[in-house]
């Protein structure tokens, strides 16, 4: 009877230990997945480094600046790679960035552009719309980068 109690206690201890290990593994896996999906946190540094390597998306900035100089009343035609100055180079810079950093990179570039050009009101809304759709013009994922409302940039 004493042997049976010892065996039962040992099995119970193994069962509890096994459950604790499985729980810890699940929690660790969940945290790692959240970090991979979230471009903020430690991945934000990676995005900044990629922006540096891609010269702060300078060709995208030049492309958007050129777009702002055109009349907003012109009949817009679909833009494709190879048809617009700086668009090809912008697409190449975005292509060399990780997919999870592309939208954040465009937001960083747009903040800088806003400061340089002192954009506000309708101009800011216009450049935001163009930046939101830049990845689809480059045929890259994600196809669209929401930039938030105009008030988010004030």
Curated annotation (Swiss-Prot):
Compositional bias per record (Basic and acidic residues), positions renumbered to this chain: 37-52
SMART domains membership: AAI
Propeptide: 72-76, 151-154
Gene3D superfamilies (alphabetical): Plant lipid-transfer and hydrophobic proteins
An annotated Gene Ontology molecular function: nutrient reservoir activity
Keywords: Disulfide bond, Seed storage protein, Signal, Storage protein
A Pfam entry, by short name: Tryp_alpha_amyl
InterPro entries: Bifun_inhib/LTP/seed_sf, Bifunc_inhib/LTP/seed_store, Napin/2SS/CON
Cysteine-cysteine disulfides: 47-101, 60-90, 91-138, 103-145
Signal sequence annotation: 1-22
This protein's record includes keyword Chaperone: no
Region (Disordered): 29-52
Self-association state and partner proteins as the record states: The mature protein consists of a small and a large chain linked by disulfide bonds.
Functional note: This is a 2S seed storage protein.
Family in the record: Belongs to the 2S seed storage albumins family.
Protein name in the entry: 2S sulfur-rich seed storage protein 2
Source taxonomy: Eukaryota, Viridiplantae, Streptophyta, Embryophyta, Tracheophyta
